[in-house]
Amino acid sequence: MPEKKGSSSEKVLYCSFCGKSQHEVKKLIAGPSVFICDECIELCNDIIRDEVPAESGDAKAAKSDLPVPGEIKASLDQYVIGQEPAKRTLAVAVYNHYKRLKHVQGVGKKEDVELAKSNILLIGPTGSGKTLLAQTLARLLNVPFVIADATTLTEAGYVGEDVENIIQKLLQNCNYEVERAQRGIVYIDEIDKISRKADNPSITRDVSGEGVQQALLKLVEGTMASVPPQGGRKHPNQDFLQIDTTNILFICGGAFDGLEKVIQNRSEKSGIGFGASVQSKTERKVSEVFREVEPEDLIKFGLIPELVGRLPVVATLGELTEDAMVQILTEPKNALVKQYQKLFAMDGVELEIRPSALTAIAQKALARKTGARGLRSIMEHSLMDTMFDLPTMDGVQKVVLDEHTIEEHTKPLLVYREQKASA
């Protein structure tokens, strides 16, 4: 019994586990008709720590949550073909960013060294994989992710989206969990389209260009953004949610068409004289020129100096080659060929795409100058009629796509079960 009578008429309480009285222990905690002392609680904690060491250690959890740069790049390799320098730069930048978050959260006292945030700027032609890189990173790290189009943003008070709408979309993606949203990734696409229209400031308002850049400044650097709750502005009496953007990683991407001319003009001015290396403009690829980009080039292009300073990590992506296009069609986890083979398999039909057809698709996509985005439209156009007729056709076992289908727009070869059996 946990209760016994003492010499005086008062009740003395005893631990139900070790039998010690309330006078022999520091604390006795009551439960439903039972008591437990502080010594027994400490003993229970020791047993749990010994038997479940993995769950009690924060180090392992931190390690599993935070892949190292090599693992990040290996995951990117599964989805993104080529662009090795950009993948390495991104892997290191993202690793350092989330290491910084662990440093901020794990340290209770004020540290001497304060780690600053390094946002990322991706420069590369259309269809080179900028958005895919950001999407793959967010999927790997299991953090909220949102893509914002810079061309739809305007200054506050004008028709269009405010920059705070980006944070609201991020909140929506994580079901309005503020803590998760504050560790998310924001990808701002077409950042080059909000460049200043001219080098010298204009007297007229540039509400979708420099004005948006000014509005993005504090958001990218870190500020308390006021976001309406789930009900939006329909309930004006509700308090706005306060989101700290200090720990949100911002990745900005753009094609920066014309930036290569700015870089070349700068390099040509610096390369004057007998010792200067003479090289024709046509000899160098745009991707090679982009690798030499300096902050002053981005400012000359039309980004304001303050925004350039807040995007310290610059990764450049190159134009895709024919071989890279063929690899994109077949190698990634969600490769286009695998997707169409899965669609045809749902109808019980095998899809075979010959190597000559893959080369023809890659060449056609390169001619369109839309990067990897052009691959799907070419595949869709080549297989459209077959996908329309196939569900109502009997006996088809295989569809074969060759270079003639791509180049001459002929119908793919159909192999029937009877023909295959007789062969």
Curated annotation (Swiss-Prot):
Residues 3-56 form the ClpX-type ZB domain. InterPro entries: AAA+_ATPase, ATP-dep_Clp_protease_ClpX, ATPase_AAA_core, Clp_ATPase_C, Clp_protease_ATP-bd_su_ClpX, ClpX_bact, P-loop_NTPase, Znf_CppX_C4. One of its GO terms (biological process) is cell division. Pfam families: AAA_2, ClpB_D2-small, zf-C4_ClpX. Zn(2+) binds at C15, C18, C37, C40. One of its GO terms (cellular component) is HslUV protease complex. ATP binds at P125, T126, G127, S128, G129, K130, T131, L132. GO terms for molecular function: ATP binding; ATP hydrolysis activity; ATP-dependent protein folding chaperone; protein dimerization activity; unfolded protein binding; zinc ion binding. Keywords: ATP-binding, Chaperone, Metal-binding, Nucleotide-binding, Zinc. Component of the ClpX-ClpP complex. Forms a hexameric ring that, in the presence of ATP, binds to fourteen ClpP subunits assembled into a disk-like structure with a central cavity, resembling the structure of eukaryotic proteasomes. ATP-dependent specificity component of the Clp protease. It directs the protease to specific substrates. Can perform chaperone functions in the absence of ClpP. Belongs to the ClpX chaperone family. PANTHER family: ATP-DEPENDENT CLP PROTEASE ATP-BINDING SUBUNIT CLPX-LIKE, MITOCHONDRIAL, ATP-DEPENDENT CLP PROTEASE ATP-BINDING SUBUNIT CLPX-LIKE, MITOCHONDRIAL-RELATED. This is ATP-dependent Clp protease ATP-binding subunit ClpX. It comes from Methylibium petroleiphilum (strain ATCC BAA-1232 / LMG 22953 / PM1). The lineage of its organism: Bacteria, Pseudomonadati, Pseudomonadota, Betaproteobacteria, Burkholderiales.
